[in-house]
Amino acid sequence: MAESQQQTIINLHNSGVPPDVIARQLDISRDEVDKVITDAEKSTKPPEPPSLASFYLDAVVDLDKAIKRAQERVWKALKVESRFDLSTEETQEILSKLAKTKVMLVILHIDLVGSTRLSSTLPADRLAAIVQAFTQEMSITITAYGGYVLKYVGDAILAFFLANDDKYLPCINAVNCARSMIKIVRAGINPILNQYDYPEINVRVGIDLGENVVVQYGWDTHRVDGKKLQIPHYDILGYTINIATKMTTLARPDQIVIGQMVYDVLDDRQKSTFHPLVISPEVWSYVSDYSQGIYRLYGTA
C-alpha cells in the first residue's frame, strides 16, 4: 500500500471516521485499514502540546505588527487580489477528539455593525471585499490568542477557547483578543478602507463561558486521489452560544459585552474596564444557573 494512502487512512481515523467507512470510501478491505491503524498506534507518539489558550498570550502578541500586516492584507484584498485561504480544519480536528462529550468553552461572537445598511448601499463586489477583509483579519487574531474559529455566519464569526482545566487564562485571552480585534479594525482595516473610499466599519463582541456538547452534524465531502471521501462534520451545541450571540446584539459599536461567568473569573484590573449593563427584562431575561437571578452582563465603556 502506498505511503500516501496509509497517511490518508490515519488522517481519516484521527478525524473520527469509522474503519468500515474508510474501507468503503477507499475501496480496500477492512483488514487493510485495521492494519494501518494498528501499526500507527504502536508507534511512539510525542504528547500533544497544551492548547495555546492555556497560556497568557497578550504579552506575546505584537499588536503593532498585527495592525501593519492587516493594512497590507486589506490593501491587497481591495486593490490587487481577493484571497481567503483560512481553514477550519484544525477546529474540526479538535472537535473530533471531543465528540459526544461535554466541554467547558469560552464562546466569542463578533459581527459587523450596520451590515444591512452596507448591503443596501454598496455594490456586491465592494461589500464582499469588506466582509472578506473583516473575516480574515478577525480569524487571524482569534488564532493568535489561542482560539478556534467554529464557523462563519454571514458577517459574523463564532469562535471558542478551550477552558476545561483552567477558566482564567481562556477568559483573559478571549477578552484581550476582542480588544485587539477592535484595535485592528480601527487602526488596521479602516484607514485602508478610507483611503479607497470604502465606508469605515465597526464591530461588536459578545463573550461568555459555559458547558457545551460537541456533536456530529452530517458529513463533509472531499475528493482525495479522485475518490470521494466523507469526513464527519462537528459542531457545538449549548446554551452558551445562544447567550453570546444574543449578548452581541446588545453591544454598542466597538463595545465588548461579557457574561457574569466571564466577569467573575477576571482579575481586578480587567474587571475595572467593565461596568454592569442595565437592560430591560423584556429585552434580557436569561436566568443564571447558579444565582437563580437574571444573568448579569457587563460592557466596556
Task: State where each predicted segment sits.
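Catalytic/regulatory signature loops of cyclic-dinucleotide turnover enzymes
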Residues: 232-261
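Catalytic NTP-binding/metal-coordinating core of nucleotidyl cyclase/transferase enzymes
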Residues: 93-173
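Catalytic core of nucleotidyl cyclases, primarily class III adenylyl/guanylyl cyclases
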Residues: 145-170, 189-236
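Intrinsically disordered, glycine/charged-rich C-terminal tails and inter-domain linkers
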Residues: 11, 17-21, 27, 31-87, ...
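Short gly/ser/thr-rich secondary-structure transition/capping motifs
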Residues: 87-92, 188-189
